[in-house]
Amino acid sequence: MARIAGIDLPRDKRIAIALTYIFGIGRPTADKILAETGINPDTRTRDLTDEEVARLREYIDKNVEVEGDLRREISLNIKRLMEIGCYRGLRHRRGLPVRGQRTKTNARTRKGPARTVAGKKKK
């Protein structure tokens, strides 16, 4: 089983799909990585040679931000927005949608379960 960036890639999937199991690598990035390293995207993970796995590992370590480093960078960006007090930071702090979605109705994922307001009855 190939282990890249601390993730065990599934053996029976094509390498183009298996790379997407790494946080920070989607389909377009996986295709770009395989083109740069010269590996056929249709190859199954179990059929990769040790040399190909080493090439993949080296390329990803040098050129792509993945897993823990990427998660840390994202959380630091959100923390920075909250510290400077910009609108997006305030929305993060209050747990509301950040990208302009409506909140009069919907937005339940961000706001949590509905809290009933006393004195509001439908007639």
Swiss-Prot record:
Keywords: Ribonucleoprotein, Ribosomal protein, RNA-binding, rRNA-binding, tRNA-binding. Residues 95-123 are annotated as: Disordered. One of its GO terms (cellular component) is cytosol. The keyword Ribosomal protein applies. It comes from the Bacteria. GO terms for biological process: translation. GO terms for molecular function: rRNA binding; structural constituent of ribosome; tRNA binding. Gene3D superfamilies: 1.10.8.50, 30s ribosomal protein s13, domain 2 (4.10.910.10). Pfam families: Ribosomal_S13. Coiled coil: none annotated. Signal peptide: none annotated. PROSITE patterns: RIBOSOMAL_S13_1, RIBOSOMAL_S13_2. Located at the top of the head of the 30S subunit, it contacts several helices of the 16S rRNA. In the 70S ribosome it contacts the 23S rRNA (bridge B1a) and protein L5 of the 50S subunit (bridge B1b), connecting the 2 subunits; these bridges are implicated in subunit movement. Contacts the tRNAs in the A and P-sites. HAMAP family: Ribosomal_uS13. Belongs to the universal ribosomal protein uS13 family. Part of the 30S ribosomal subunit. Forms a loose heterodimer with protein S19. Forms two bridges to the 50S subunit in the 70S ribosome. This is Small ribosomal subunit protein uS13. It comes from Heliobacterium modesticaldum (strain ATCC 51547 / Ice1). The gene is rpsM.
